[in-house]
Amino acid sequence: MTYRDAGVDIDAGNALVERIKPLVKRSFRPEVMGGLGGFGALFDLSGKYKEPVLVSGTDGVGTKLKLAQQLGRHDTIGIDLVGMCVNDVLVQGAEPLFFLDYFATGKLDIDTAAAVVGGIARGCELSGCALIGGETAEMPDMYPPGEYDLAGFTVGAVEKSQLLDGAQVREGDVLIGIASSGPHSNGYSLIRKIYERAGSPADLVLDDGVALIDALMAPTALYVKPILALLKSHGEAIHAMAHVTGGGLTENIIRVIPDGLGLDIDATAWILPPVFAWLQREGAVADAEMWRTFNCGIGFVLVAAPAQAAALEQALDAQSLAHWRIGQVVTAQGDERVRIG
């Protein structure tokens, strides 16, 4: 018997590497040392930082991956994977430096894997982050035919003096919410149940003219480049930041707020995007459940000094980022630290 007889095709893996090399190399930065194929990937950190603090993150895309496989949409799920990781390390002011991925499947389909990794490379390129390595694991009997799993890993850096840890947050600080591109990569176990209960309406068009499946599969917004530019020009105005992921608005912003303080969020400050309105209506989802499951149209939040909030908003306008003042930091009232109304 051979390894191929057992279900592992080394030649297919090598063919995939050759297919993705040009895509991966487009994401490289000058600090990347060497190419693909080594036992470890190399990145030279010596030239840019005085006192670098490394910030690491890892994530997946949840069961959005199941929907992507169901719909045969493999080309953008890699962007989601990158977004979930790089937006997280961005919260602490870090510039994502490099990214690694893990792709696991029962039987390697080169076209599918190349589409997925192409999306990862594109997400890295859009985030200024080098895709310097990864693992493609072909594991017979571990996954049903046509299915695969993904995980991503990123490392960023920030000057120690510029690290954002929430310590500067004060009562009265303003919450500026930046628009999401859709559900991003959270809440998809509920989304898939609602979609199936509604009869999997692949042809349905939402009130804004966007097809439902396009809205559900819209790639996670990549906030890295605009937010890094904002930190460079208005960093003193930003006291904390939050990436709105699993747990929604209720559980994510509060993670960067010190004890003794809470949040008063004005849900009338922005209009619930059509895809979320459809999900709430079709799934009969209560408001409180919406807030703690989905981003509801707000993908990233700046906690800003009130005197400088207007300048931040002007800078966001200049970058064509939709945004709203969605609330403020208040003194916490007992155990209830987040009020949305």
UniProtKB/Swiss-Prot annotation:
Task: Supply the Gene3D superfamilies for this chain.
Answer: PurM-like C-terminal domain, PurM-like, N-terminal domain
**What EC number(s) does the entry state?**
6.3.3.1
Which pathway, metabolic or otherwise, does it act in? Answer: Purine metabolism; IMP biosynthesis via de novo pathway; 5-amino-1-(5-phospho-D-ribosyl)imidazole from N(2)-formyl-N(1)-(5-phospho-D-ribosyl)glycinamide: step 2/2
**Principal location class:** cytoplasm
Question: In Gene Ontology terms, what is one molecular function of this protein?
Answer: phosphoribosylformylglycinamidine cyclo-ligase activity
Output the Pfam families linked to this UniProt entry. AIRS (PF00586), AIRS_C (PF02769)
The Gene Ontology biological process terms listed for this entry are: 'de novo' IMP biosynthetic process; adenine biosynthetic process; purine nucleotide biosynthetic process
Write down any Gene Ontology CC term: cytosol
Q: Which SUPFAM superfamilies match?
A: PurM C-terminal domain-like, PurM N-terminal domain-like
Catalysed reaction(s)? Answer: 2-formamido-N(1)-(5-O-phospho-beta-D-ribosyl)acetamidine + ATP = 5-amino-1-(5-phospho-beta-D-ribosyl)imidazole + ADP + phosphate + H(+)
Q: Which CDD domains match?
A: PurM (cd02196)
Q: Superkingdom of the source?
A: Bacteria
- UniProt keyword annotations, A-Z: ATP-binding, Cytoplasm, Ligase, Nucleotide-binding, Purine biosynthesis
Where found, per UniProt?
Cytoplasm
Q: Give, as one word, the top-level EC class.
A: ligase
Query: PANTHER family from the xrefs?
Result: TRIFUNCTIONAL PURINE BIOSYNTHETIC PROTEIN ADENOSINE-3, TRIFUNCTIONAL PURINE BIOSYNTHETIC PROTEIN ADENOSINE-3-RELATED
What NCBIfam families does the database record attribute to this sequence?
purM
Family membership, please give it.
Belongs to the AIR synthase family.
Q: What is this protein called?
A: Phosphoribosylformylglycinamidine cyclo-ligase
